[in-house]
């Protein structure tokens, strides 16, 4: 009996190492591009439109990967699919390093985002299968590692691009090779692990038609979409807002963004047990509502209340992992399909959301007129107000879902 328990603990430990390393790699691959993009643009002489097209193409690759990963999981199993996603990241690092023509580089970058999309779905499915106790705590702990690597990745990437190896500067190509080669670590742990759920007969799996008829899943799509738009938009717009609206210098504005990410990571590390205690649905309402209140209060209070922009990170950090925990609990036999559908729809929603923010800023600026000195400030306030509105809509959708589930006695 003791031998069986020891073996089980070793298996579970390897599963945890694989998923935690996976989230670290995911955070690295998504966030090393910031320092590299200006150098990539210079080396290939790309204009802003070409650079935008490159990033849009990669977003498309990410969505494509999200859509077919569940099929790979059903056909080959989650272990093989996870290894494939890590391997594609590793290969893309090698191809980026040897790509000196733009078409070859664009194809290599596209492969990286295919791997990125596969990895997001694979990690979510792994979490849903592995974490059967304290689901909220463990989901948030896993995503803490994503937040941690996201915070340090740009700093490491910046430093690594100036490192010399055998008399040659690594630059951005070498940096991508080294950072993405870290994908080898979770490949090794995955090879030594076994994962539950692959042996489940097809007839026991909840079919997509049945999932699609569940209103709760559609509310989850809306909650996740609004939550992720509010989360990701901060990284893209906060520094810009502070520099142009309050005339902060880049160092000071970036410092507040770093505090946002710090609180974001702390929230996932510390508040996970709260979601298990009070329930996932109620947690979604409280945390997204808190983020919305902080954002609107920061806008209303002006520069002296700008610290509340960072405080919003505590609330919005909880949305993604809590939604994954909800799906794992509600659809134990259909979590693969439910996660794939929800994340793919969220991806579409987040692309649309970022376009809307830019549109709102420009529309309000034009409304005030080119000659109005406050036009830019009002436009930026309106755009950032939309970020707060997304958090508020996330809370409202959570409230509607709470009432729906409570009436049916299905609260989670």
Predicted features and spans:
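Conserved MFS/SLC helix-loop-helix module at the cytosolic interface between two early adjacent transmembrane helices
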Residues: 64-103
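Cytoplasmic helix-loop-helix junction between adjacent transmembrane helices
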Residues: 108-144
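A late C-terminal transmembrane helix in Major Facilitator Superfamily
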Residues: 333-369
């Amino acid at each position: 009996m003791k031998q069986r328990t020891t073996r089980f603990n070793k298996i579970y430990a390897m599963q945890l190492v694989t998923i935690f390393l996976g989230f670290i790699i995911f955070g690295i691959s998504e966030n090393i591009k910031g320092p590299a993009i200006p150098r990539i643009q210079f080396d290939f002489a790309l204009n802003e439109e070409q650079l935008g097209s490159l990033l849009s193409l990669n977003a498309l690759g990410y969505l494509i990967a999200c859509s077919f990963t569940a099929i790979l999981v059903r056909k080959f199993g989650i272990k093989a699919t996870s290894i494939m996603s890590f391997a594609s990241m590793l290969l893309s690092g090698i191809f980026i390093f040897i790509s000196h023509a733009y078409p070859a580089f664009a194809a290599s970058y596209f492969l990286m985002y295919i791997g990125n999309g596969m990895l997001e779905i694979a990690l979510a499915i792994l979490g849903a299968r592995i974490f059967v106790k304290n689901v909220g705590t463990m989901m948030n702990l896993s995503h803490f590692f994503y937040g941690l690597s996201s915070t340090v990745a740009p700093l490491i990437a910046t430093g690594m691009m100036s490192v010399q190896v055998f008399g040659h500067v690594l630059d951005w190509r070498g940096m991508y090779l080294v950072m993405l080669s870290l994908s080898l670590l979770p490949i090794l742990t995955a090879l030594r692990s076994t994962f539950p759920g692959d042996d489940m007969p097809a007839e026991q799996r909840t079919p997509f038609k049945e999932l699609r008829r569940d209103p709760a899943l559609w509310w989850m799509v809306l909650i996740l979409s609004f939550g992720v738009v509010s989360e990701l938009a901060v990284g893209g717009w906060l520094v810009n807002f502070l520099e142009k609206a309050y005339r902060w210098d880049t160092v000071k504005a970036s410092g507040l963004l770093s505090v946002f990410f710090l609180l974001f990571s702390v929230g996932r590390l510390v508040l996970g047990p709260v979601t298990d205690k009070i329930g996932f649905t109620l947690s979604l309402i409280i945390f997204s509502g808190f983020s919305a209140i902080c954002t609107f209060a920061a806008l209303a209070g002006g520069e002296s209340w700008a610290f509340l922009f960072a405080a919003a990170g505590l609330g919005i950090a909880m949305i993604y992992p809590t939604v994954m925990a909800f799906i794992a609990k509600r659809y134990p036999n259909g979590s693969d399909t439910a996660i794939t559908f929800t994340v793919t729809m969220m991806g579409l929603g987040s692309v649309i959301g970022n376009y809307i923010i830019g549109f709102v800023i420009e529309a309000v600026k034009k409304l005030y007129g080119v000659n109005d000195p406050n036009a830019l400030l009002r436009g930026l306030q309106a755009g950032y107000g939309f970020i707060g509105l997304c958090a508020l809509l996330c809370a409202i959708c959570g409230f509607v879902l709470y009432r729906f589930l409570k009436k049916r006695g299905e609260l989670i």
